[in-house]
Amino acid sequence: MEGSFNILRYDHQKSLWDDFIESSKNATFLFERDFIDYHKERFDDFSLLIFDNDELLAVFPANLSNDVVYSHQGLTYGGLIFKDTLNTNQKDEIRTAIISYIKAHKVKSLIIKPLPEFYYSKTEGISNFWESHSNVIKQHLILAIDYNSDFKIHKTKLKRFNKLKSNGFIIKESPEELSVFWNEILVNRLNEKYNAKPVHSLSEIERLKRAFKEEILQYNIYRNGEVLAGITIFKKGDVVKSQYGIASAIGEKLNALDMLFVYLIYLFRDEGFNYFSMGTVNDNSELGYSEGMLKQKQELGCRIFTQDIWKVDIHD
């Protein structure tokens, strides 16, 4: 018992956890247990459930590594997910209880990578709790289109898009497009261009697609029967996010990825979404971000949002 709260480690309370996530205005499907646990063998789970008597007030997706609690190393973002009716003071009391709980478990520090701001309800009270209890150790630049703003796509990209149909390009979306994209483009091109691998293997993303049929979509663009580029989309609430997006060598010469992005930008605008996130542009360069990726995403109509990574030192 931490103050008036009862804090429990997650231990197969899947239905309780998932029901809470689904009822929250500000959670995403990445916080559901089927997503968190698809690679559970890689992480020592330290997820927490916070109760007031029998009432679940908050959940905290997290993992433990070398005396540090992270929220969460296996997810794009983490942080506390609260019951929607809580006010700012109640949320800060829970944050304090979390720190006390992990201190009692001999944890040295807590690192939190919160949801980008556009996932949050506009009416939610803003707390300065982390500003006074932690330090910013990194700042990610997140590029996203705000559909409620007067966003503009660069005229060159629009010109290419306008030739999409007349030049014989075809766009397909189906579960089967995942294996086409992974096997024919994504794995090889990430290795060639960045000496990197996808975060998800093909079997993992297919398993996630089966669990989240409506939230994970794969769009590929073809010409003359050849796949040229693909974009993997994660959808939640009024936000869509491009999780992967890359072209083949031929597709790059034909600007196929630009055409596919512009197609999706208009598609999701017309479907009523508020934001289209294209992810971070941070890298290991001296600047800390890719100038080329920043320019590319800004030309697609994105603006910069920041995501602060917080570190709380736990003192004895």
List each model region and its residues.
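Short Asp/Glu-rich motifs
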Residues: 121-122, 183, 286-288, 316
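A gly/proline- and charged-residue-enriched helix-loop-helix capping module
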Residues: 73-121
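Short, high-confidence coil segments that cap the C-terminus of an alpha-helix
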Residues: 43-45, 104-107, 216, 270-273
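A conserved beta-strand-loop-helix scaffold within acyl/acetyltransferase catalytic domains
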Residues: 3-53, 60-68, 114-144, 148-251
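Short, solvent-exposed loop/turn segments at the edges of secondary structure
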Residues: 73-77, 138, 305
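Aromatic (often tryptophan-rich) hydrophobic motifs at membrane interfaces
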Residues: 60, 81-86, 92-99, 214-315
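Short, flexible, mixed-charge acidic loops at enzyme active sites
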Residues: 68-73, 293
